[in-house]
């Protein structure tokens, strides 16, 4: 399993819609880059200048919305993941 360091988070992307609301099938080139994902793992937190560690606000299992071009895409054991910093997370869904 991937274990992120510091204030990083590993997420599994929620797949983009295959069709529009009116039923038109979208080709790969027309799909929006996904901005939603499920948190798979979280790092130990951010370290302040005084050495104190601050825990992350998100937890494994949370559904999140993140910045459009944030993070680094990685493939691990055949699954695509995104590793990003907690500051790139915009909201927790639900």
From Swiss-Prot:
Gene3D superfamilies: GroES chaperonin. Its main location: cytoplasm. One of its GO terms (cellular component) is cytoplasm. CDD domains: cpn10. Keywords: Chaperone, Cytoplasm. The keyword Nucleus does not apply. GO terms for biological process: chaperone cofactor-dependent protein refolding. One of its GO terms (molecular function) is protein folding chaperone. It is found in: Cytoplasm. Belongs to the GroES chaperonin family. Heptamer of 7 subunits arranged in a ring. Interacts with the chaperonin GroEL. Together with the chaperonin GroEL, plays an essential role in assisting protein folding. The GroEL-GroES system forms a nano-cage that allows encapsulation of the non-native substrate proteins and provides a physical environment optimized to promote and accelerate protein folding. GroES binds to the apical surface of the GroEL ring, thereby capping the opening of the GroEL channel. This is Co-chaperonin GroES. The gene is groES.
């Amino acid at each position: 399993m991937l274990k992120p360091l510091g204030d990083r988070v590993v997420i599994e992307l929620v797949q983009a819609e295959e069709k529009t609301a009116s039923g038109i099938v979208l080709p790969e080139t027309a799909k929006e880059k996904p901005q939603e994902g499920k948190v798979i793992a979280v790092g130990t937190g951010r370290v302040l200048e005084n050495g104190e560690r601050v825990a992350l606000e998100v937890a494994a299992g949370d559904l999140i919305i993140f910045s459009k071009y944030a993070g680094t895409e990685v493939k691990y054991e055949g699954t695509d993941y995104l590793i990003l910093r907690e500051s790139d997370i915009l909201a927790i869904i639900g």
